[in-house]
Amino acid sequence: MAFDRQKLVEAVKEAKARAKPRNFTQTVEMAVNLKDVDLRKPENRFKLEVVLPHGRGKEPKIAVIADGAVAEAAKKLGLDVISGEELEELAKSPRQARKLAKKYDFFIAAAPLMPKIGRYLGRYLGPRNKMPVVVPPTMTNLEPIVEKLKKTVRIQLKNNPVVHAPIGTEDMDDEKLAENAEAVLNAIINKLERGENQVKSVYIKTTMGPAVKVER
């Protein structure tokens, strides 16, 4: 790979050093700028789920849209549950639906409710790349899915030749953040026709901090 792990570590270190202290733990983000990608062609756009080897650094907000067994399984794990009835209510309140789409990082949904989710929430979840992980209505153990989501980031290449991804939080070890960055980079490169030759540049920054270029 064209990006040396040590160069990623150095960029992470510098991005953290240049970030002013804030009264919250900042996310560390990566931007991958691409070249020679014709985004007018749908086959060149993509959505990806990447499991970060060292996790996201903070717990993602997960909601479960379900009734019955799946709802009970979600409650056992302390997850927020949206029932089929509440889903119907959201159809009458676009403002609440928008708010819901913004509030959670991931959704898990029981399969029978997917047609309604598509109808009532699709327009808010789709553009945010937050369509639910679908599970059968009889599932009684959501723990494996939840544990995986805790380490997962969703990324997409849509209208602009740049891919943004959170790779952890500023209180994480530099090496671990670099390994997370590497996992995301490799996933993106694997989707490109000419691989790393189509990566123009990579930047790392904290939420409020300046962007630091990763040297090659």
From Swiss-Prot:
One of its GO terms (cellular component) is large ribosomal subunit. It comes from the Archaea. GO terms for biological process: regulation of translation; translation. Keywords: Repressor, Ribonucleoprotein, Ribosomal protein, RNA-binding, rRNA-binding, Translation regulation, tRNA-binding. InterPro entries: Ribosomal_uL1, Ribosomal_uL1-like, Ribosomal_uL1/biogenesis, Ribosomal_uL1_3-a/b-sand, Ribosomal_uL1_arc, Ribosomal_uL1_CS. Part of the 50S ribosomal subunit. Binds directly to 23S rRNA. Probably involved in E site tRNA release. Protein L1 is also a translational repressor protein, it controls the translation of its operon by binding to its mRNA. NCBIfam families: PRK04203.1. Belongs to the universal ribosomal protein uL1 family. HAMAP family: Ribosomal_uL1_A. This is Large ribosomal subunit protein uL1.
